Amino acid sequence: MSEQEVKELDLNGEMLVRREKLAALRAKGNAFPNKFRRDVLAQDLHNQYDSEDGEILKEKGVEVQVAGRIMTRRAMGKATFITIQDMSGKIQLYVARDNLPEGVYKDEVGTWDLGDIIGVKGTLFKTKTDELTVKTTEVQLLTKALRPLPDKFHGLTDQEVRYRQRYLDLISNEESRRTFIIRSKVVAGIREYFISKGFMEVETPMLQVIPGGASARPFVTHHNALDVDMYLRIAPELYLKRLVVGGFERVFELNRNFRNEGVSVRHNPEFTMLEYYQAYADYHDLMDNTEELLRKLAIDILGTTIVKYGEYEFDFGKPFERITLHDATVKYGADKGIVKEDLYDFDRAKATAERLGIEVQKSWGLGSIVNAIFEEVAEHHLIQPTFLMAHPAEISPLARRNDENPDVTDRFELFIGGREIGNGFSELNDAEDQNERFDAQVAAKEAGDDEAMFKDEDFVVALEHGLPPTAGEGLGIDRLAMLYANAPSIRDVILFPAMRQK
């Protein structure tokens, strides 16, 4: 018999015993009571009483009602020490036969298993080891767990099981709970920041007839009542800019985007983005906003501007570096023989890319080739927080052209730890230029570029009504959460990541 078969046999045996206990509970009446009310969380008790002297605490006779899942139990004859876990943390219980009504210790407490959810009433005291504990006087089983918890000494170590059965991961791993608490604080902090700056939170369509706002492959679905193919949105950008045209001059949205692309440690097909738009601002203002926001999040969440991620340490209290895409490519590509002139001539750029082993697509112009060279030689060097600026117009179809050099745009990408965290630019508000760039994207799609943008005629019409000078930015919430939680994979910060079917 294999080790796996032995484990399954043991599991089936334990579940059978637990089901028999549940059957006995059903025979007595309500097996899942719902009248117990907790009046305090475990961590609140620790915060208030951990430093309290044991004798003084005993004299106070603090009564509490706590509830949670049984994580450990240690029987000692007529008494049992139990640790329960609630959403805030853990608290120890002292359950003694002599402190409970007759028969309760044997007939009820004796049947409890790890994983069961209980509610108790009692008074606080300190053990000989000075551990805050609840001396229970009333107990109640609230939920009988039919399956055992993962091994208490090794926890849940199988990564795939952690992602597929996130509930077990959250029960077993304190670090995972901490990660998702940090993620929640990131979202709350962003919302608070933009509302304090006078932005209005809005919601735009998830189902779109024309998927716009980014270069990506969309998910396709069909609306039966309208008998029309629709797309899960890849970005809310074009709808948000319509709102600026309509007079809502500061808007933001925190919501999901969908892209029918690969899965990796940095990519999930369903992900959360912040997008915001600010009239009468340019991309320099947005870079300033971003530095301020990330600094504030670090202080609020971590208590410091120092953010540690893997082997790296970032100080969000310092100004972020700002460098153009062309300058970064020359700076970090010098050891590969790249010079400035290679990036301003199509033939030289194409030859340079091919020398680097880049497969140049037929639909690429000079801008796309230069961007591919940057990604090959420079992107992974942008470790410290860096704003990469002045992207080629060819790869920035929604961004405003630079006044001094119309071949590039007033655009930036934020890189931290060699990864793109955000993307923003001064918005293109020239309707005729936008129409021409959409046409160029259509030509690229017809030439085989699956990720080229669709043309949105209605958006062009909106621009023809007049978009004020505006700047907009998108920040990846998942990647920000990875950063503040020091999580190596995007799956670690998404509660239920996309997984291949078994």
UniProtKB/Swiss-Prot annotation:
Q: Which reaction does it catalyse?
A: tRNA(Lys) + L-lysine + ATP = L-lysyl-tRNA(Lys) + AMP + diphosphate
Identify one Pfam family in the record.
Answer: tRNA-synt_2
Binding of Mg(2+) 2 occurs at 420
Query: What are the binding positions for Mg(2+) 1 in this chain?
Result: 413, 420
Which residue positions does the secretion signal occupy? Answer: none
Q: Which domain of life is it from?
A: Bacteria
For this chain's record, the cofactor binding note is: Binds 3 Mg(2+) ions per subunit.
The coenzyme or cofactor needed here is:
Mg(2+)
Give the matching InterPro entries.
Aa-tRNA-synt_II, aa-tRNA-synth_II, aa-tRNA-synth_II/BPL/LPL, Lys-tRNA-ligase_II, Lys-tRNA-ligase_II_bac/euk, Lys-tRNA-ligase_II_N, Lys-tRNA-synth_II_C, NA-bd_OB-fold
Which GO BP terms sit in this record?
Answer: lysyl-tRNA aminoacylation
GO molecular-function term, one example from the UniProt record: ATP binding
Q: How does it assemble?
A: Homodimer.
Q: Which HAMAP family match?
A: Lys_tRNA_synth_class2
Q: What is this protein called?
A: Lysine--tRNA ligase
Record organism: Haemophilus influenzae (strain PittGG)
